[in-house]
Every structure is written in structure tokens, then in C-alpha cells.
Amino acid sequence: MLHDLKTLWKIKRFRVLLTARTLSNIGNGMSPIAMAFGVLSLPGSNASSLSWVTASHMVPIVLFLLLGGVVADRMGRARVVGYADIVGSFVVATSGVLFLTGHATVPLLCVNAFIFGTLNALWWPAFAGLLPEVVPSENLQAANSLVGLGTNIGFTLGATMGAAIVSTVGPGWAIIGDGLTFLIAGILVLQLQLPTKMQTGEITKHPSMISQLRQGWSEFYSRKWIVVIVVCFAFINMCFEGFLGVLAPVQMKEALGGARDMGLMLFAFGAGNIGGVLVSLRLKPKHPLIVAMGGMPIVGFWMLGAAVPFHIGVLMILAFVSGIAMDLFFVMWMTMFQTHVPEESLSRVSAYDALGSTVFAPFGLFLAGPIAHWIGTSETLYIAGVIAIVMACAALFNKDVRRLEPIAELVKVD
């Protein structure tokens, strides 16, 4: 493990990428608390209002992910990530200014959320394929772990800062801080200056966009373990997005300590994410996806705990363990994904992965508020928790998921 860490730290491009991801996730930690309690503070707003804003961010991600995968493979992943972060920083900052000037409305925030979601649709497939361009393939698990560690330290710090800023000076400044982190991260990523395959002469002409999408689909669908996990996560993410984006803030406001308790719970979740990364640095399981999916049911139990609702201390414990489980999944999944899928198709296959995994997430966000208003927040959380537990367990019934092993001999990249 220490050898991997020393090797990675000597790679300048990896250090730059790690720094950028850590910084941007400080903003990502601020954003959920700031936007949720900012929207809920608007005159006449309720859980349904928050559903509209959060879903407006998720819908374009689902709509444009496949386009994002093709764009990333054509234009260069570092370039797409960098420019998406920079443009996104101004979009986010605009929302912050709307809150500060008293001009924030649900329709305006929905428009901004849609624009930012479109940029995220370009960002995700590009970032998913970026790491294998930066580090040797035999160090990918350690690299994913370290990026996850930086990501989660940033998120945990951001959640703490976000709760403090929202509680003292309001959501507007926290959202502007979020935008600033994206601006710095985007500038850093553009410094990587990774050449595209067209620039290196590996290819002289891009195939058509349609043929690239078909090739990506073929690579995606031919790996049944990817398809099974993606289908299960379509339902898990539907529940989790509705939980974290709408139901948890509403439950905190109605039954617990508001933004302060939401910040504490997100802090515990981020700390668990860090713990999961540290555990993943030590693990070399023969069947990584058994480990990855084996802990995911705890996320559903976290939702059930919020439904009761338990004391914030208990919810922090559930959030912490859920964080461990989710980051173990992330590291194992990304390592298997990056080593079993051809490098030249990574962004496109990742786009199909992200599209399938998030296809129901807008419904979770759109419906969470109205259903909670109709049958109650706790009752809605019970339903979400049960669905998440069932789907997390279902993946392990597939033999391809259970039997997948790491590739013994990995080819180095320059």
C-alpha cells in the first residue's frame, strides 16, 4: 500500500487532479445544505418546491449523459472536466447572488439547476475516464482510493462549513463559496494538458457519433455484471436522491434540529466515506463486487432510521456506516470498471453506467415532496428505505456479480 502511495504522489498530474477534486468537493459538501434550506426558507415554499429544484438539476444529467460520453472521448477528458467546472462555477454563483439580493424564486433556481445539471452531464463521463490517463493501471485501486479520500475530506469539510454558514449568514454565501471551489478546480484540471488521441495520432478520424454510441452500448451490454449493478442502482439512487435531496432536510426541519442536525448527519456521512476509503486501501478481495454490494443495504437502514426518526446521534452512526459502505462500493466498482472496460471506450460506457444508474433519480426527487405531503415524510422514508435494501441485496443473486475477479496482469500506461 505504501509503495502505491509513494508511486502516485510522484506523479504531478495525479497531484493536480487530486487537489482539484478535493477542492470542488468542499463546494459539493456546502451545496446540499445551502440549497435545501435556502429553498425551504423562501416564502410559500415547501417540500414540493425543493423537489422541483433538485429534480431540475437531475433531469438534464439523465438526458445528456450519453452525449457527454461521446464529447469526452472526442474532445479530451481533462478539457471537458476543466471547462465544465469553470462554466459551472458562474452558474452556481448566480444562484448565490439571487439569494443574497432577495431575488431567488423557485422557477429561477430551477433554470439555474437545469443549466448546471447539463454541465454535470458532460463532467461525469469525462471524469470517470480521466484517472486511467494519469496513473499506471496497476495503481488504479490505490488511485481511486486516494481520490475518494480527497473527495470525502472535501465533502466533510464542506458540509461542516455549509451548515455553519447557513446558520449564521444564510445560504447565499455558502452557494457562492461552492462556485468559487469549482472555478479553482476547473483551472487546475486544465493544467493537465492531456492530449487527445487525434492529437497523438492514434486516430486520424473520429467515427460518427451514432457509431460511437453503438460501440459504447455494445461494450456496456456485453458485461452482464455492469448491467445488473446499474439496474439495481437505478432504484437505490432513486431512493437516495429523494432522501438526501428532499426528505432528510424536510424531516430535519420538521422533527429534529434543522440545518444544524443536517450538517451533523452529513459530517458523519463524509467521515464514513473517509473511513471507507481507508479500508479500501487495505483490501484486495478475490471478488470485489461481493464486498462492494454487501454493505449497501445499510444505506436503506439509514433511511429507516430517519423515518422513525431516531435521535441525531443514532442517525450520525447510521450515516457514518453508510458512508463506509458507499465508498467501499465506489473504489471497488471504479477499479473493476476501469480495468475491465477498454480505455478508449471508458467515457462512453461510463455514460451508459451513469445514465442507467440515475434514470429514476429525477422521479425520486420529483415525487419525494408530493408523496411526503400526501402520506407524510416518515411514511415516505419507510418506503424508500425498504426499496433500497431489497435492490442492494438483489444484485448479489447474480453469479456474474459474485464471481467477477480483478485482472491478474494489467498493462501499464505511459
Please state what every model-predicted region is.
Residues 1-10, 200-211:
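Short, membrane-interfacial amphipathic segments enriched in basic
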Residues 44, 76, 98-99, 103, ...:
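Helix-breaking motifs and short loop linkers at transmembrane-helix boundaries and internal kinks
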Residues 129, 133, 175-205, 397-410:
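Helix-loop junctions on the cytosolic side of multi-pass membrane transporters
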Residues 36, 92-99, 162, 166, ...:
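Structural signal for membrane-spanning alpha-helices in multi-pass inner-membrane proteins
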Residues 3-59, 218-269:
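Helix-loop boundary and gating motifs at the non-cytosolic
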Residues 15-32, 54-70, 76-91, 108-167, ...:
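Substrate-agnostic recognition of the 12-TM MFS/MFS-like secondary transporter fold
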Residues 36-43, 96-101, 157-177, 254-255, ...:
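Transmembrane alpha-helix termini and helix-breaking/packing motifs in multi-pass membrane transporters
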Residues 53, 62-63, 74, 80, ...:
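C-terminal transmembrane bundle of multi-pass solute transporters/carriers
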